C-alpha cells in the first residue's frame, strides 16, 4: 500500500531547513541524503568560502541529518541510510575537486558508523553515480557548449562516449538501485560504495 507524499521546501545547509524536513517526518525508517554539488572549476578559483560551502553541503549537512535520525532507527531495529555521493570519489577529476573532496570526506564517516549500527539492522551505504541524464548533466553540457563552442547534441555525445555503456544513465535505473538498498531485502549490505557508472570504473575495488 502506497503512503502519502509530503513535499518540504527547505535548505538542508541550514539548521532551520533540516528541522523543517524532520518536522514533516520525525521518525523515518529510510534516509536518502543528496544535495547540490558545487560548480566545477580549478584549484586557483577556490577560496575559503568555496571550500566551506562544499563541505557544508556535501559532508556536514548529510552527517547532521544522519545524527538526527539514527537513534530512532536503532531503537526500532530498522533503518536504511543511503548517501548520494559521486563516482569521482573513486576516480577524481581535477575540475571537480570541491565536490570530490567533500563527498569523499562523507565516505569514511559513513563506513565507520555503519559498523557500529549494523547489529541494530541499520545499514548505511553510498551510491556513486556518474553521467545520469539529469539537470546536473545538462549543466555540465552547457559549460562544454560555452567553453568549446559545441552544440547540445555534440556535448551530450561526448559525455556518452566516456561511459563504457555508451549512453547516459536513466534516472529510473538510479532509483531502482537506491530502492533496493533501502529495502528489507538489503539488510546484509552495509558500508558499501556502489558504483552506478555504466561499467566505466576501471579499478577492482
Predicted regions and their residues:
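Conserved NAD(P)H cofactor-binding loop of Rossmann-fold oxidoreductase domains
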Residues: 34-40, 199
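Short C-terminal tail/terminal secondary-structure segment
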Residues: 91, 179, 190-205
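Short, small/polar-rich loop/turn modules that mediate ligand/substrate recognition or access, typified
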Residues: 118, 123, 189-191
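Catalytic loop of short-chain dehydrogenase/reductase
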Residues: 80-105, 110-119, 130-132
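Substrate-binding pocket helix/loop in short-chain dehydrogenase/reductase
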Residues: 42-44, 50-55, 159-160
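A short, exposed helix-loop element centered on a Lys and neighboring polar residues
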Residues: 66-67, 111
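Alpha-helical segment proximal to the catalytic Tyr-Lys
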Residues: 71, 115-116, 187
